[in-house]
Curated annotation (Swiss-Prot):
It is found in: Secreted. Disulfide bonds join 32-71, 37-57, 43-69, 47-70. This is Putative defensin-like protein 83. Keywords: Antimicrobial, Disulfide bond, Fungicide, Plant defense, Secreted, Signal. The keyword Signal applies. It comes from the Eukaryota. Residues 1-27 form the signal peptide. Belongs to the DEFL family. GO terms for biological process: defense response to fungus; killing of cells of another organism. GO terms for cellular component: extracellular region.
Amino acid sequence: MATNKFLSILLLSLMAFAAILLPMISGQIITCLPGECTNPSECNAACKSNGYKGGACVSMSIGSTTGACCCKPNFKSQDSFKSNDIIINNN
């Protein structure tokens, strides 16, 4: 009984750890600009001026009227890479 409970807790801990670690490993860390964010269009413009795809105000607590301006990364997935100039040499 105690072993089953320990294994359940261990499994849940590993799942939570993986859920936190996977975005970091894949490089999908979201950048947030310093200061408060009250206007989403200003946040979007600020992110675009810094080279990001865009941005949005993200509330850090429930019921908060302000948040942080977080930017969307401006890179493509490696899966979307297509090239027609691949040479296959069968020598």
